[in-house]
Amino acid sequence: MNANQAAESNLLASNQQKELEDLPKDYPLSTSEDEGDKDEERKHQKLLESISSLNGKDRQKLADRSEASLKVSEFSVSSEGSGEKLVLSDLLEPVKTSSSLAAVKKQLNRVKSKKTVELPLHREEIERIHREVAFNKSSQILSKWDPVVLKNRQAEQLVFPLSKPQSAFAPIEHVVNGWKAGTPLEQEIFNLLHKNKQPVTDPLLTPVEKASLKAMSLEEVKMRRAELQRARALQSYYEARARREKRIKSKKYHRILKKGKAKQALKDFEKLQKVNPAAALEELEKLDKARMMERMSLKHQNSGKWAKSKAIMAKYDLEARQAMQEQLARNKELTQKVRAASESEEEGEGQEEEEEPLVPDLVNEVQIKANGLNPWMFRNHFIDAKEAEVQKDLEDPAEPEAQETSESEEEKAVVEEETLLKEFEERRSLRQKSELNHMAEPVHRRVTKDPSSQEVLSDLRALCQKLRTENHQSGKQELSSARTAQREEPAREEEEPMLLQRPERARTLDELEELGREGCVENEELPRTAVEGLQLEKNLSNHIGAPKEKKRKEQMIDLQNLLTTKSPSVKSLAVPTTVQELEDEEERDQRQIIKEAFAGDDVIRDFLKEKREAVEASKPKDLDLTLPGWGEWGGIGLKPSAKKRRRFLIKAPEGPPRKDKNLPNVIINEKRNTHAAAHQVQVLPHPFTHHQQFERTIQTPVGSTWNTQRAFQKLTMPKVVTKPGHIIKPIKAEDVGYRSSSRSDLSVVQRNPKRLSIRHKKHLENNCVD
């Protein structure tokens, strides 16, 4: 309709235009007519505008006229008035009744049942579907390995290859069944074993025992089983007891156990000696021979390959350390001299082990000389060797001196002297053991050689005897006799070295008080003779005026005073003081030792110089803009004037105060180290949840200096360990308990990826959604 209206309007406009063009040709125009023409044009223009503004709906509809015709065309069919479309079934209505068109009907029904074929998907869409399906399927397959990957990531250490081949051990019966005797000796042994029915393996019961059990009655079998159970229980009890005893680390327990075993062996030997003297003599010869062989073989001297290897591993292995300790104990046992110990000595040793000292060991230490030599530069092993020689000499049995007279008093004095000497030797050995742990010893102590120590001991006994005989005389006579006895030996004392002077160990509070009363410190500035005379007078006056409370203690004090030979370089015994004074003295000695050790190093001056340089380097520098030759002469040897320098000098502002400004003993470097920035952590690492955890881990020391060997190995063990020569294969599904499927949903895509039907696409999409 709109098209018809537009055509009509165009036709009308063209007709009017033609009429206007033809007007001037028919009629000539005048001036008045020109004015009229203008008015007409104006009116015509308005007419055109009004025509163009008209709506097509308001126009009248032209009527169509149809005429009958003899020739009917297919285009003349009109469906006007019906309101329905023409359907193929309407045309086939008259055909339904005819039976000749049955085949056409079937074909028509088949065509009706078929649906329209969808267009094939585009290549990009097919590839996108392939990618989505492959991603979903591969992520589903890989998600099965998440627990395995997480376990490997959380493991402290991974040792590759992960699958360790299990070594197959063939049973002994399989080995024996295929074995044949090759030599006559093997054949003879094999025949004996099979003849007596001895088990080749290690069964619970032998064939003989099985046969005997079959022959037993029920009661005998029960009794036999009860005996076996009791034997097993006893065996397990003794094994547990042996394990408990082996874990005991008490030295006192092992010492008592060792003494008990030695006493039991001695009792068994005495019993054997009474029953069978010949066997006892043979046993004694065996022991002596074994001791001689041990001493000759030197296997106990820590010089063999085994000892050296154990010494290296003793730091890490407890068993190696125990083996080294046993060897050292064996060495000490073999190298010491054989001396029969009396019962009284054994009882005394037992009492000394059981008793605990009431006075601490710090009270008995001798104060070290403040201005002495540096003990770090002194060789202690030389002194230890000399002390060992003196100890061996002192352990030799003393010669009896009581044979000269037959009086009872002299015999008692000799017995007391012998007991005092033995006690002195025992205390001396104890002091030597305790002083092995000291870091330094005074340099001015020296040890006598063998002949000199014997002579001093003989002089000691003579002087003790003189003192006992002259106790009833007057003090003046005792003083004169002691002075004469002292003057007789000056040359010998100057030529020979002195005995090692050691303080007496006070074990009770009474002994501590007595030592406090009797001990005194000698003035070193006095001459030798004056000091000796004063000391002798004081000792003799103490002996005369002191009450006789305990004779044994008095004799021991006399022995100690007489044994102490004075010299300007040797200090006397120090009076026991409190623990605080000893600590102060140790601090002073330590300061003196450090001062002597670092005598050539002026550490404080170097430190102050280094700090001064660091402070100067950290200060902001002034900017000098002076240029030579500007405003004045310049050249070699000419410097800018001070006025010009002050004019062009830009002073730098003062920087912030240093952190170590009020810390004289510290240098704090405030510069940013660019090399350290690469090792700084910007983000918190994965396993940690808080920065304090990470800082605590970083601050924990890792080195072997601050940790035990086991902890150091655990902290520094590598994350991954690979064995050389082994092939590392990838993990298989069978290794972790999964079954590998031979067919998957991706098989269709992998087989023909470019031909993906709609059915397969829907199936794959449903699987992806699931």
Curated annotation (Swiss-Prot):
The keyword Lyase does not apply. The modification Phosphothreonine is found at residue 206. The modification Citrulline is found at residue 588. There is a cross-link at residues 449, 732 (Glycyl lysine isopeptide (Lys-Gly) (interchain with G-Cter in SUMO2)). InterPro entries: SSU_processome_Utp14 (IPR006709). GO terms for cellular component: nucleolus; small-subunit processome. Keywords: Citrullination, Coiled coil, Isopeptide bond, Nucleus, Phosphoprotein, Ribosome biogenesis, Ubl conjugation. Citrullinated by PADI4. It is found in: Nucleus, Nucleolus. Residues 1-17 have a biased composition (Polar residues). Residues 343-358, 396-410 have a biased composition (Acidic residues). Residues 41-68, 217-291, 318-348 form a coiled coil. The modification Phosphoserine is found at residues 30, 32, 53, 78, 82, 406, 408, 453, 567. GO terms for biological process: rRNA processing. The keyword Coiled coil applies. May be required for ribosome biogenesis. Belongs to the UTP14 family. Interacts with DHX37. This is U3 small nucleolar RNA-associated protein 14 homolog A. The lineage of its organism: Eukaryota, Metazoa, Chordata, Craniata, Vertebrata. The gene is UTP14A.
